[in-house]
Each structure stands twice: as structure tokens, then as C-alpha cells.
Amino acid sequence: MSGTKWTDEQRQAIFTKDCNLLVAAGAGAGKTAVLVQRIIEKILDKGEPIDIDKLLVVTFTNAAAAEMRERIGDAISKGLDEDPESKVLRKQLTLLNKSNIMTIHSFCLQVIKNNFHTMEIDPNFRICDETEGILMKQEAIDELFDELYEIENEDFINLVESYASRKDTRLQEVVLELHRFAKSAPFSYDWLLNMAEEFNVGEEFNFEETPWADMIMEDMKVLLHGFKNMLQQSIDVILNSEGIDYYYEPFKMDLSFINSLLEKSSFKEFRGEIIAYDFPKLPLKRNKDADKEAKERVKKLRDKVKKKIVELKNILDSYENEFIKKEFIFLYPSMKALSNLVILFDKKYEAKKRERDLIDFNDIEHLCLSILTDKNSEGHIIPSDIALDYRKKFAEVLIDEYQDSNLVQEVIMSMVSRVKGYWSFYNGQLMFNEEEINLEEPQICLDIPNRFMVGDVKQSIYRFRQAKPEIFLDKYNEYSEEEGTKNRKVKLFKNFRSRKEVINGVNYLFKQIMSKTIGELDYTEEEALKVGASYGEEVKGEPIELCLMDKKYEISEEVLKEYNVDEEEALDNIQLEGRLVAKKIQKLVGNNLEGGLKVFDKKLGEYRNLQYRDIVILMRATSNWAPIFVEELAKEGIPVFADTNSGYFDTAEIKTMISLLQIIDNPLQDIPLLSVLRSPIASFTDDELIDIRMVNKNITFYECMEIIYRLYKNEKLDSYYSFYIEDENKINKIIKDMNEKLKNKICSFIEKLKLWREKSIHIDIDEFIWFLYVETGYYGYAGALQAGEQRQANLRILFQRAKQYAKTSYKGLFNFINFINKLKFSSGDMGSAKILGENENVVRIMSIHKSKGLEFPVVILSGTGKNFNMTDLNKNILFHRDLGYGPDYVDTERRIAYPSLVKNIIKNKIRLETLSEEMRILYVALTRAREKLIITGLINNMDKTVEDWLNLSEDKNKVPEYAVMSGKTYLDWIGPALIKHKDAVSFREELKMTSELSNIVDDKSKWKIELWNKRELLKEKVEEDEVEISEKIKETLMNLEESNYKEEIYKRLSFKYKYDNASSIPTKLSVSDVKKQFILDEKENTEELFKKLELRKPMFMEEKKKISPSERGTIIHLFMQHLDLKKAENEEDIKEQINRLIEREFITYEQSKVISPYKILKFCRGELGKRILNSNNVNKEMPFSIEIPALEIYKELDKEIYKDEKLIIQGVIDCYFEEEDGLVLLDYKTDYVNDIEEIKNRYEIQIKYYEEALNRITGKNVKDKYLYLFSVDNYIKID
């Protein structure tokens, strides 16, 4: 029936039968089409057709299931058009509605509903809403903690003291996270208990024989391979350079040592050899003909190897068996208590769900698992009778997106598939054993395997949902490509989506960086994508573009002045990357003289001009970056939409409605009440609110309104209100003098509020919210505003949430507000309502995860210089599904806390798995592009970074694994791969990287690497603004030529004030202003520095921006002002001090992120920190004002006229302290430092005035003056 021309590999995937078939389908390989065609061939087979309801087809999403059902229905309908009398086709069309094409959760739910009698659940059970589940979990854990405190459970108390810090919430979070994590294991109680028992070691314990030891050794061997390459590279240089051959022997010995370590299989031998090795000293021969550059280069490489080996020695030296044994024994009670605590919590949570006849999302899989599994007499997990019935029913089980399966899903699918074997626990891990098992009823058709699995492990990007790509990989490595085998694999790597330029670039990059270590698969020629799409010769493909910008490209104040740009705008790197992307889009779409890109339209079958809708900007995460990009693109007139999961609760209409609900529940809340009173719902003015507050400043705002209401209505005040009225006559006078209109307004609002409070009790919350929309007119008002359709859509979402809540077991307005608050914080906010159609002509911004399965003519991947998110590694207890618990070692009696050995191992394992996930996410991003791919990113210190990339280019075929392992951004991977590509030559030349590369790669992929800088982007922006302004000026001047007042206008515009020089001199100057004046070119006119006041938008009207460098400096200065050096012994102490400032609301949490505990600790432990500690007289943030002659600053002024003019210089001294022989002045600087001498010159005059101020104020000598530079963690002395 299909007219599609299938490739040989696709035909194998469609027609191969009687085996377990794994189809590895690369990006754009048409796997959905293949899966659908396989189903169609099965149900329409002329020899042995299979009814469609005898197939189980498991998809990843409901949308995928619906699409698959639709495709199959279309194919059957098309067949009926050709053969209307076909009984087979008619039957299959009828059965299609009964087909088992569904998600794994839908299948599990079907199993539960058909077999609820085997479980202790009500047949009328309901699946609880996610937020309802969160509320129940919080109730359960609060009750559990209260109970355990009450009975003074010793294990629980010890656990709290060790891991709860100051609040129980931290331990509660650990329990909730571990509970969620354990639910990804098929038998979660077994997993929890087994993981705790790993710490229960006896006297016979030998760490060297554990899997942990092997893991340490294997991870270190990856680094050793890198060291081997470095040493081999050094030997090559020695042999090919003049006069340094005497280095050959020691380098050869080092290389032999590394090779010996790589061959070791015993951890004991590996550890012993690395600890015992001493690097031989290099000969001190002098040879005047020696190649000094080569000599220095190999010495640097060897020093780097030596340093790393010493680090490994220190790590291995700490892995002493007795020490580790004691650590395990000490941690065992806590870990056992933790497992038991999670089990107790789960039982309490289960009881709460049973009371309400509820199950949650996790229960669906676990209940299904318990229905489908039994244990035999040997404790092996085997299929139940119900599972055997499913094996009889399903002729084939087809699983889509198999790479995203978790272990629970894998066990479920194995129970209903015809596979030989059983599951059992081995060393705490659930393993599948492919062996015969004895069943009371013989297994059905076990000789005919019936599993079809399709996916791409390179696109497995859901590890955070506990997806386990190893399930796919194990089969991929074990299954054979030979015909006739019972476990077979087929590879579909021909890409029918992208141009060859995109495919060649993707292949080049991932051959360089993806490996079993990072990515969990070697990306070889065999795994590489093959070109399958044809774009003809009419339009040539373009190279992949890499656009880089240096974060540290310093813009001088002169440049800022020249382009009239303030510091914040100039230095917001995300904003500038957004501006760069906007420029690229303008060029692509053709908003300039060069014309735009042509793309092929599949529907039209021809090329057309690129439209905005053809472009997507992909980001790793959109929450912080997308709004800034939207702003920049909008400035350039580019229509744009950002698909984010945030911002909904910040919209004005939702904040107003939630405030209204809050005061209906409890009006004694000033902030939400004032929000409603100022809104169109009540329309009070600021002056009216002030009049109300004058009644009494010591009670709530509502109580003030209530007093006015009662006295105005001549109602008697009860004792509660009378208590707050000190002078009733005074209050009566205030009310008497009050505007009559205001009093009526207050009465009207109070009466409405009382009515609403009463009504909220008697109707469901969703009805009540809609009643408020209509009663207040707010829904109609929101619709009349700008973006009214969007605002009303947001209000409808709140109504839908209320409707959803009304179906839960929780009732009432108070609980609904809690429900919304939990939704806000547990789900991390959510995006605004989507009112945008698919065909809207806008550029879309979305996360890489949301783009999976989609394709776009043009893809721009941005934010590639952003660090990977590794914050989870800092938690005090880590969890790993295979390795178990990784806790901190906490001894409360001795007040000792440090990461345990097993935590360090697990931390490294999770880090590598996270990097592998990031590698696959990068692959997904790059393979979304059909015709054009652009990558943008910011780099810290371009010259140094590129130099580092060049040092990693010794192997032309692969970026060293150790370098990939140490990567912190996508650019850390992309850069070293591309720097040795033949297309990077001009880029290297632009950076004046003249050193020759011996390993330039002549690959067929095409790249264009561009270096952008901030000055360039600022200049372009200003030039565009200037063109627009000049056009307006021209238009005005043309009109002026025809004006009767032309001469008078020119005369007035040409007027010059006689004492203009004097008017430009301020009466006060800050020290920073003085500094600026002194660093200006001597010829520069003073007026340029102190221009007349320019009007800007007030801050409250400015759009929210990221923390600027100047704000960063202010935050760090504020912290240093409050820093207690006596309580700063480690980073934890400093974090505590940061948290204290947050709690006292000196800084926000977002602002606290710019303070580096590591850098602060370096200051505290440094010379200046120690001197401050030893001083008995330390002063911080001391303001001063001193008077000086104006001519001291303004030397160009007439000396006779201005000899008596004075200026006030004012400033704030960061810190000064007293020692025996004088004062020490200290000033903190957060500037980026490029040149020490330049920094000294820049701040010399500033420090001079600080010194003069201290001399005048204290009468004491300033003996030392220092600048402390946080960017380099060091100080410089000012002479």
C-alpha cells in the first residue's frame, strides 16, 4: 500500500520478524514512518494478518500515540478507497478504536482497571493532581516528623542532627527527594534497604575488591590516557628539536610508567605503583644551540602531568582500607535510619491516598508491576498469571523512544513480552537473567520472541526523569546485525531531514567529542549520520556558523562616552548575545541590501524566501535568557515568541486576582489588600489610601477601613477596635473631615468584601472565581487592555486550575491559596497561556528539550558558553540508582563534617553521567536544523581560551577524553574540535595565533567562525539610532527652511551663556568623578566629563535587567562591610554569613550568587585578612567630605578668576585599620584586571584623596595603601 521508497535498512526494520528487534534510528531517519509501516504490514499481511488490537504499541507521549493512530487510519482508509470490499481492511478500521496504541502509563492504567480486584484499591479510584499529591506529601511528612519527635526516636534524632542543619525542612527535602528517586526502582523498598546495607561491612571488608575501587581506577585511567598523549607529544617535540635530546630518557621513563598503570587490572597494584613512583629529575645541561621554545614547551607539559599525578597520589593515599571501613561502619546507622524513614513516610503517604481513594502518577507503574509479577520459590521475579495472559494476547510488543525507558518500565514490558528469563537482585542491583524458568503453566511461544524496540540512544535526554539509557545500550552492544538471530539490531542512520552541510558538521563534531566515557557511545563512522535528503543544486548549502564573543572584552569609558551607552547596557553579556542573534536573523531574513536566505518548502515543492517562522532559537534553559533575547529581537523589529515555563504568576492580572482571593480568605493582610485597592477592582488613589492609614498606624489597613465603616454607619465599635483607639474624638474628626465620596467608597468595598467572603463558603472555588470575574468586571477590563487576549487567557487558566482543584480531596478557599502557592514553588512557576498559532510568522525561542522530535529550516543554538548546571552535586546526601547513597560524614560530637569517600565516588559518577546527558542534549539541538545552523556563545578571555584549545589539538581525530571530561560548557567541547579544522585558519590568524598546527583536519564539513566584540555591537546599534535621528533632523530642517521664524530660531539656538565654564563646575564631586577627570586625555574638554544632566527613565520604569558589573561591585562591597573575619574559617562559615544578609534582607538570593565564598575565603586567609584580624581598630565604609581648591581639578580654568573657588570632594573608604606604626588603607575592586599598571594608574588619584581624608580626619599617618582585586584574588600596593 505504501508508495514510499524504503532503504534496505528501513525494509529490514519493517519486515524482519520472529526475533527481538532493536532499531537504532538516528536523528531524521524516519523512525515513526518505519514503525507505522511495520504495524500496517502486520495488520494487512496477506498471509497471516494480525488484528491491530493484538499489538501493543507503547509511545512516549499521548500526542505521538494519536499521530500514530491517525497515520494508520489514513493508510487503512486509502486501502479501502482502492478496495472498498476488503473485509480485512473494514475489520481493522473497526478495531482501530480498540487498539492498544498508548503511552506506558495508559497501558499500566488499563492493567490496573482490568485487575483492580487483585489489589487493595477501590475500583472508583482517581488519579490525584500533582499539586494535590504535593500537599498530601507535606501533610504526611509533617505528621511523621512530629510523631518521631514525640517518641524521641534515637535514630531519627541522630539523623536530624547530622543532616537537617537548623531546620527540619532540609531533611524533609532529602526524604522527599529520595522517595521520588526510589520510585524509579522496580521494587523501591528492596532498593532502599539494599542501599543502606552496602554500609554494613564486617571485619573482612576489603575496599580494593569493591566495585567502587574499580570505578576509581577506570576514571583515573581516562586521565592517564590524556597524560600519555601529552608525554608522547613531548617526546615527538624532543626528537624533532635542536639540542634537547638529553630530555628523551626521563620522558621515556615517565611514559613507561603511565603505560604500566594503564595495563593494571588490580586496584591494589594500581594504587601501589602510582604512590611509589618518583619522577626522575630533568638533566641540567646547557646547550646554547638548544631550541628554547621547544624546551620550555615540553617542560610545561611535563610539569602539568606531574602536578596531576601528585593530585591522584593524594587521592589514592587517602583510600586506606581501615579508614574506609571505619567510615562505612560509622555511616551505617544513619543510612539505615534514612531508608527506614523514607519507608515510613511512604506508608503514611499511601494511607492518606487510600483514605481518599487516590493513586498518584508513580503508583500507576508500581501497581501495574505488582499485578504482572510474582516471585518463585527461589525469590526470582517471574511473570504472574495475568502477565501470561497478556503474553498470549499480544502477538508483538512495539516500544517507541526506547532509549528513554526506566527500569520499572523495562520490567513491565518484559513481563508482557515473550522473553526467556527472570529478574533477580545481585549485589543490591536488579538484573535480568536470560535462562529458562519453571512455571506452573508453560510459557507461551517462548521460542518466538516478539519485542520491537526503536530509539536513538544519542537522543536520550531524560535522565532527570530517571530514564536509563543503559537499557538501550546493553542491547545495542549485545544484539547482532546478522539475519536469523533471535536478538537482532538494525541501524537506521540515513538522515532525511538535513542538508549535507549540517550532517557533515554534526558528524565531524561528535566524532571528535562523543565517547563511551562522555556520551556513553563511541561516535564512529558506523554511528555517523548519512545524507538522505535531497535539496537539489538550485540553492547551495551554507557552512555552519560559530559566532563567538569575548565576555572580558573591556570597553573603555571613552568608548561608552563616544557611543552614549551606559555601563549596564554595555556589559550585559546575555543582552549582547541576544543583539548578535538579532543581527544574524536580520541578515538571514533579508532586512538589508544583501538579500535573505532561500529555503526549500516541502509543501510547495520549491524554494522560497526565509520567513521568521522558519527560525528557532534553542537554549539549554529559557527562564533567564529568553526574556532578554525577546527584548533584543523586539528592539530590532523582529517578531518573537518565547516558550518558557515561567512568568505566569508575575502577570499583573494573575497577581491581582490572587491578591483578591487572599483578602477574601483573610482581609488582615496589608500587601494583597493594598494591591486590590489600587487595582481597577476598587480604584482607590494614593491620597485616599493615605487618608485611611491616618486613622491608626499600628493596626492593619483593613482594620482602619473597618473603623471608618462602623463609625460612618453609626455602628458601635466592639472592645477589639476600642482597644486601638486612644482618642475617639480625634478619630471622629478625621472621619468627619474625610471626603464623603471616599467614605462611600470604603463602605461599598467593605460590604462587597463581606458578601464575597460569605459567598466563598457556599460555592465551589471554580464557580466562585468566575463569579468574581463577572462581579468585579475584571475579566472584561483585562480584555480591553493591551494584549487583552493574552490576559484573558491567563485568567482562564486560573479558572481551569480552580476547576482542577475542585475535583481534589481538598476544599475551601484557604486550601486553594495553599494549592496555588505550592504550584508556584514546586513547579517553578509556569508559562503564560499560549495563544499563538503554529503558523504565526514569529521567531520562536524554546528549550532544547521542547525541540526534541521537531525540525526547523534554521536553528540558532545560543548560550553555549553558559556553565552546565552541577548544583545538585553540592547536596549533603547524593543518590545514585546503581551505587546507592553518597552522604557527607558528619560527626556531631566532634563537630566534624566532610564528604565521605563513597560520596566523592558517586559525585564523580553523577558528574560524568550529567556530562553524557549534556553531550546528548547538544546532539539533539544540532540535529533539529534542516538547512542552516548557527551556534553562538560567550567566552571568558578569548586569547587564553583559544590557546588552551590549541594545546588540545595533538590528536587530529579526537579531542582528548580528559579535556571533554573537564568541560564546563558546550564551547569547551566545540572549541577544541573546531580550532584544528581547516576552516579555522582565518580565525586563528585574526587572533594572531601564529603557531603552526601539525594536525590540521581536512574534513569535508564546512564551518565559518566569527569573532564578535562588544564595541562592534554597540557601534552598530548606535549607528542605526543615529541614522534614524538624522532623518528626523533633516525632516525638521526642511520644514524650517519654509518657516517665517527661521532667523529668530537660529539666533536662539546659537546663543552662548557668558559664564558657561563656571556653570559646568559642580559644587560637589565624588572621588570616582575626580578619578575619571584625571584619567581623561589632557586635551579633552572638561565639559565632556560633566555634561548637563541628561534625563533618563526613572528606575521603576526601567525594564528588569540582569545584575550589572557596577551592581555586582556594590553587592560585594556590602558583604565585605558586614564580613566577620573571626567567623570565616571555611566556605561554609562564609555561606552562613551570606545567608544571614539574605535573611535580614540586605541582599536578595539572586544578588547573593555574585558573592564567591571561595574568593572571600582567599581574602580572609591572605596577608591582608590576617592583618585585619590582628588589628584592634578596624573601620569599614567610612564616609567623608573634604574641601579642596577647584583649580586642583580644573587646571584649564583661568587662575585669577577661579583662585578662590572651592569644591567638596566626598567618598566612602572601604576599610582602614590601625597597626603600631600607622594606618593601613584598603580599597576593594571588582573590575576585570588585564594590566596591573593600568589598574594602579586608574585608581592612584582616588587613593590619594582617601589618604588625605584619613590624615585630616584622624590626624594619623597612613603608612600603607592597598587595592584588593577580587578578579585575581590578590592585592597591589599603591606607593
From Swiss-Prot:
It catalyses: Couples ATP hydrolysis with the unwinding of duplex DNA by translocating in the 3'-5' direction; ATP + H2O = ADP + phosphate + H(+). ATP binds at A25, G26, A27, G28, A29, G30, K31, T32. It holds the Pfam family UvrD-helicase. Its EC number is 3.1.-.-, 5.6.2.4. Residues 4-499 form the UvrD-like helicase ATP-binding domain. Its cofactor is Mg(2+). Gene3D superfamilies: 3.90.320.10, P-loop containing nucleotide triphosphate hydrolases (3.40.50.300). Residues 526-853 form the UvrD-like helicase C-terminal domain. GO terms for cellular component: cytosol; DNA helicase complex. GO terms for molecular function: 3'-5' DNA helicase activity; 3'-5' exonuclease activity; ATP binding; ATP hydrolysis activity; double-stranded DNA binding. Keywords: ATP-binding, DNA damage, DNA repair, DNA-binding, Exonuclease, Helicase, Hydrolase, Isomerase, Nuclease, Nucleotide-binding. The heterodimer acts as both an ATP-dependent DNA helicase and an ATP-dependent, dual-direction single-stranded exonuclease. Recognizes the chi site generating a DNA molecule suitable for the initiation of homologous recombination. The AddA nuclease domain is required for chi fragment generation; this subunit has the helicase and 3' -> 5' nuclease activities. Belongs to the helicase family. AddA subfamily. Heterodimer of AddA and AddB/RexB. This is ATP-dependent helicase/nuclease subunit A. It comes from Clostridium botulinum (strain ATCC 19397 / Type A).
